[in-house]
Regions:
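Multi-pass alpha-helical transmembrane bundle typical of ion/small-solute transporters
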Residues: 1-297
Length: 297
């Protein structure tokens, strides 16, 4: 891999990055404070909003550092957005299996994104740090990315019909917390007292709790756990891909985070246009092979 600029961690840069990210999140959270379905028009607006936020930070990188640094930032941003498509399709399958209403999906995606912000930081610091061990690390990363592309080619198109009750995250939550099998508003957890009140309702007479406890996890939390796990697995593709653009941790992390923050709105666009985007996954596979080649070229 060719040498790329290393800008390090400046207090001013970190402060500006944090300001942009938190301000955008607060505006987004306020706008979506109600559990209402998000229309295609609204999703498009908020996708453009987050693109504008990400582009504005790219402008800061251009002015504060250099055009080359800004170009690396935008290249990494584009890679992250493109590679996120497959992860979003996987999330659609999770929501479909759990029967999550569109009004509640934004809440799951919001908390999922916050988790991704933390996990990406860990992955980026580890990933960029590994390159100090030697050039062979690039071949390991290239193999991981190429393997992901091969797995995407070979996987069966189950159209969201996977049984997610066998998912490791589902079993992990089930092991530690009793489950209540029905949605209770947008709650991730419900108290035992609330569950007992729910069980008194005629439509819930058939429900038999396998375990009892003070607190119960709802299907919405199970959905969040699986989405979060899916994102961690996805990071094994996306982090090496963006590191193929730049080894600098601040460039890598900032471009990935601003791309991720716009994914919730992008999800609703892809969900609405899913049938018209049948070639997107193939494009992602091609991009993964390109990234694998770039890592070793």
């Amino acid at each position: 891999m060719e040498n790329t600029p290393h800008i390090g961690l400046e207090t001013e840069s970190i402060a500006i990055f944090t300001l942009f990210a938190i301000a955008g999140l607060l505006i987004d959270l306020w706008a979506h404070r109600a559990d209402k379905p998000i229309s295609l028009k609204a999703a498009t607006f908020w996708s453009l909003f987050w693109v504008a936020v990400g582009a504005s930070f790219g402008g800061f990188m251009y002015i504060h550092f250099s055009p080359e640094v800004a170009s690396l930032y935008f290249a990494g941003y584009a890679f992250e957005m493109a590679l996120s498509v497959d992860n979003l399709f996987a999330i659609m399958a999770v929501f479909a299996w759990f029967g999550i209403k569109s009004g509640f999906t934004h809440r799951v995606l919001y908390w999922g994104v916050l988790g991704a912000v933390v996990f990406r930081l860990i992955f980026v610091l580890i990933g960029t740090g590994l390159f100090s061990l030697g050039a062979y690390v690039e071949f390991v990363f290239a193999f991981m990315v190429a393997l992901s592309a091969v797995l995407m080619i070979n996987k069966k198109d189950n159209d969201g019909m996977s049984d997610f009750s066998n998912h490791p995250a589902y079993k992990f939550v089930k092991f530690f917390v009793p489950l209540y099998p029905k949605l209770v508003g947008h709650n991730f957890f419900v108290s035992n007292a609330h569950v007992q009140e729910e069980l008194k309702k005629e439509e819930n007479k058939h429900i038999v709790l396998k375990r009892k406890g003070l607190v119960y996890a709802t299907p919405l939390f199970l959905c969040l756990a699986i989405v979060e796990t899916s994102d961690v697995m996805f990071a094994f593709d996306s982090v090496p891909a963006v590191i193929a653009v730049s080894k600098d941790p601040f460039i890598v992390y900032s471009c990935m985070i601003f791309a991720i923050l716009g994914l919730r709105s992008m999800y609703f666009i892809l969900d609405a246009l899913r049938n018209a985007l049948i070639y997107l996954e193939k494009a992602v596979i091609v991009l993964l092979f390109f990234v694998a080649f770039k890592l070793v070229a």
